């Protein structure tokens, strides 16, 4: 390789993993969770706010926001109920509960660090088995509670306590702008 007279620039070293990752470069796994429609709309608004303003550290996408909210919530549960240690992983063939809600829930797809996804499943199983965490009976309910708490804090800090609004404009009949060309 030809030299241009300048010394090579070393690649940056990322020594601190992002919130939710056990280590830099950890593998991720696809995950889907169902959350209430109104929470999904707040999530969309928060992601838009974060990407437009840059005021929410480490949040550039829906996956980032879900990952950070889940990490904070699960870490708090581990501190409160398991001396800061991760909860045991549920059996590999364990399946979550079916839907037990009456309002419209929306499925969201994200990619989570493998270790965080396992911690979410372990915490959800603990919460369901012990009834020590009110309202958390499944991974979906855990993610819902984590997002609601995290978004409420963001709304207090960045939006004068008002809920974030879904940035997609609604047309008559509930259609979105994009749907009129589909």
Regions found by a protein language model. Name each.
Residues 1-182:
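A detector of short terminal or domain-flanking linear segments
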């Amino acid at each position: 390789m030809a030299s241009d007279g300048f010394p090579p620039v070393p690649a940056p070293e990322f020594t601190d993993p992002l919130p939710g990752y056990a280590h830099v470069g950890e593998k991720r796994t696809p995950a889907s969770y169902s959350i209430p429609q109104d929470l999904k709309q707040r999530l969309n608004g928060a992601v838009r706010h974060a990407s437009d303003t840059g005021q929410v550290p480490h949040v550039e996408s829906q996956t980032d926001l879900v990952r950070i909210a889940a990490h904070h919530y699960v870490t708090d549960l581990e501190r409160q109920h398991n001396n800061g240690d991760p909860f045991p992983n549920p059996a590999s063939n364990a399946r979550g509960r079916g839907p037990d809600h009456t309002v419209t829930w929306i499925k969201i797809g994200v990619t989570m660090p493998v270790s965080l996804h396992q911690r979410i499943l372990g915490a959800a199983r603990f919460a369901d088995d012990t009834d020590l965490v009110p309202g958390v009976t499944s991974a979906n309910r855990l993610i819902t509670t984590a997002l609601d708490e995290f978004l409420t804090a963001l709304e207090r800090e960045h939006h004068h306590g008002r809920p974030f609004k879904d940035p997609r404009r609604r047309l008559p009949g509930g259609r979105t702008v994009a749907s009129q060309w589909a």
